[in-house]
Amino acid sequence: MTEVLLKELSNSDIDWMLATGIREEMTAGAVLIRQGQSVNALHILLDGALTVSISQAENNPLGRAFAALEGGEMSEREITRLSSGEMVGEIPFVDAYLPSTTVRALRKSLILSIPQQQLAAKLEQDVSFAAHLYRASAILLADRLERIVTQLGHSTLVFAQPQLREILFIFAQLHDSDIDWLMNAGHVNRIPAGDILIHAGRPVEALHILLDGKITLSAFEDERNPLARAFSSLEGSDTPEREFARLSRGDMVGETPFVDVRPPSVTVKALEDSLVLSIPRWRLAAKLLHDTNFAARFYKVLTVLLADKQQAIVTRLGYGRLIYSTGQPLDKSFKYENELSSDFLAQVALAGARFDWMLKRIRGS
């Protein structure tokens, strides 16, 4: 994936990262990121190979603690491998998450580590750098998510439903002017129940925001090549698909073509009569190319949503962090996976207000 960074970053971006980052050689087997422990840097693999694994959560937290005290290692399962040009670590905009995977060197490797504090400041001050890095991150995450699903089996798509409600993040991050542009650039479509919005394996022509109703996501259960799938859907053949998620108002589909050149692996269908705002792909692509501020915010949204889907797969397979359940006493010494911060709750209110404002504008037009 070396070409992703070289293609997406500018010379000044690379110069800053080289000047700010710290180079470190890792021996085979050395741990770069440990599951459940905080990370204070973004790591770029310059040379070598890394393996990403998840701990088998067969024991309770107390059992895991004793295993650590006794020097024992819980069994782990590799979910993907990373090559030169990949990035790992907690980028500041996903700092709500503790890492759910362990990353270690597969062989002798060279790492460039950029401290989180300096990176956060750079992202805040340099919008061009932010747009470039967020886009590169989204491209790498989309590719990694596809590899994880392939490694674990396509049945794990059922676990890929995000933990974040997309409306809560999308409308909290975008500015009022961004939402205004989306409304002006898009058109509102009524989708009857049963109609297909996006065909798996075929080109996606628009970004869709669900204003009202419900839609389903389903994936092919067969292993045919994408071209065969695309033409089978054109011919109306009865190809077996499995539903793995349902989305409601405020959710977004059709965003992945902006960071992944592969055709979509899911079919999007209206479960009931639905209302969607559709922004043509060519118009959004032009906006992203010419409006750097908008691009930075848009690619930031995609990066967090992709990271959240990856997190959802790991967590819902039964690996990773603690989850608080109703009726349990809270332990302040633990950070729960589904614990909400005050900042997040404030964003919820802002997102809801912006979405309602958009609906009123659309219905009033």
Model segments located where?
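Cytosolic regulatory regions built on CNB/CRP/Popeye-like sensor folds
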Residues: M1-S365
